[in-house]
């Protein structure tokens, strides 16, 4: 059972709300930040008062007038220490440059149509020839890398080959992913053929994954209905044994979860991506699942044949290790597009959730030199909101949409040639993002202080 929990590439079920979010923030250009704190037993009442706050920059005082519903206990805090700021930023983010509060969980003041209108019309145009050129490029590189590695066949070249080839397997996956979204071309048959060839070659059931991924996009940010990398509820988290917790939140184990997720889905959810009668699918999709499973089986049979003809060691070097590098890329990228930001981001349920609010909790990431190799999958916010946009227009579409999204768009940290900075984000998230409350329509990750995130469970 422990294995099942670890091997979950998604999260689980509901993730509840931990802290109550203050809905109203207030600042002054001449004052330091103020902080609302709500006690569990607080009662709301109308406060209409005037008070003064001293400014560090000068001796002048600012008058404040409020006529809002606030918690019974209100504290004004100047010069918060780092620990308090870290806790507070999890709920209401602070724009340090302007000294303004920003509630990431508040409904946005714009609509999905507003974002769509800001994106140039040509960004929606799909060019199948251009899409196929990327397929040709990647396939040539894959076979070229394999030929060069087999030719030199020395232990200096193999590690470099494994990283490069695993990255290229990941690039093939992204192109197949575009086929699944229909952003590859307007021809469903072409999308299906190319998608099957690309995904089957790296042991991914095309239709099975396409359908579950569609569910992820349609329910992004929803604690119960999301399909990929959503959190554990507090009740489920506390029911796990120490070994399971260690495996679930200790690197590198979560980064190896994807193949197992394909077979058994997530804890708390039943179904396989290979079985036509799985709960993931509706009856009319049965034929598609059978087709994809047959293609996957054919690829597996080919690998077995090559294993006997070339030898298991050579196949391990040429295909096996690059495959697991690809899996790590997939889990690494998909996890960090929904986790690991410096500020805690909300998850929703019930009436608080909407397609727009859920999509705005996704994150863009900069991967340096890898951006072009894996087809700009790091431009994830616009991709999540409008998956029909081809990958080669995502950067332009994102730039056009930024002014509309404002603070709801979180500018990614600039990467060096390789995205090594993201390893820190991954480690921090594994240490801090453990579970969410069992109740509440807007919830945030909480941390189990006894769980280290890398070393496993810290017992008292």
Curated annotation (Swiss-Prot):
The keyword Transport does not apply. PANTHER family: OMEGA-6 FATTY ACID DESATURASE, CHLOROPLASTIC (PTHR32100). Chloroplast omega-3 fatty acid desaturase introduces the third double bond in the biosynthesis of 16:3 and 18:3 fatty acids, important constituents of plant membranes. It is thought to use ferredoxin as an electron donor and to act on fatty acids esterified to galactolipids, sulfolipids and phosphatidylglycerol. GO terms for biological process: unsaturated fatty acid biosynthetic process. This is Omega-3 fatty acid desaturase, chloroplastic. GO terms for molecular function: oxidoreductase activity, acting on paired donors, with oxidation of a pair of donors resulting in the reduction of molecular oxygen to two molecules of water. GO terms for cellular component: chloroplast membrane. It comes from the Eukaryota. It is found in: Plastid, Chloroplast membrane. InterPro entries: FA_desaturase_dom, FAS_N, Fatty_acid_desaturase. It holds the Pfam family DUF3474. Pathway: Lipid metabolism; polyunsaturated fatty acid biosynthesis. Belongs to the fatty acid desaturase type 1 family.
